Amino acid sequence: MKYIDIFELSRAKTEEKGHLTIDDLPDLKEMLKSETPKADIHWKATGTGLRRRLASALLTIDAKLTTDCARCGKSLEIEIVKEVPFLFTKTEDEANRLPIEEDGDDEIVVGSTKFDVAHWVEEELILSLDLFPADEDCEPDPESLQSQDEEEIPERVNPFAGLADLMKKNS
């Protein structure tokens, strides 16, 4: 685990970078539906001084993730390249007091002098994933589309079928 002082990074306008694998990111590993999920992630956090009177940084991620295609079940490599600007508050209350319309493109996060980089990167990757990752040009596996329980659906009975007979009896 790598921890950084996010406020010092911002103030000094320095840069931290590193590499993460799937074993560093347990929540992402659970989300990648595969027997052997993989992740090769390079990240860089660059302090950008104060913006809107708050500590700020730019997180750059270059990741290659391997999971299974939701349609055909074959191995699927997903590439995620993104830059996300962040503003850091010192408390949750301070973050909640910021007007929503002033967020702009910046993500607002509660910072720390012991900020968990792996969790930060993992959260951004999870937000970038499709719910059902799939190849753009694959065909669905017909067997996976078949219902596991091919039980016959019982014929529905019309609830009003006996209404006419009931009305005749009561008249």
Report the location of each language-model feature.
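Cys/His-rich microdomains that often coordinate metals
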Residues: 76
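Charge-rich, low-complexity linker and terminal segments
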Residues: 1-13, 87-171
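A positional/architectural concept
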Residues: 1-66
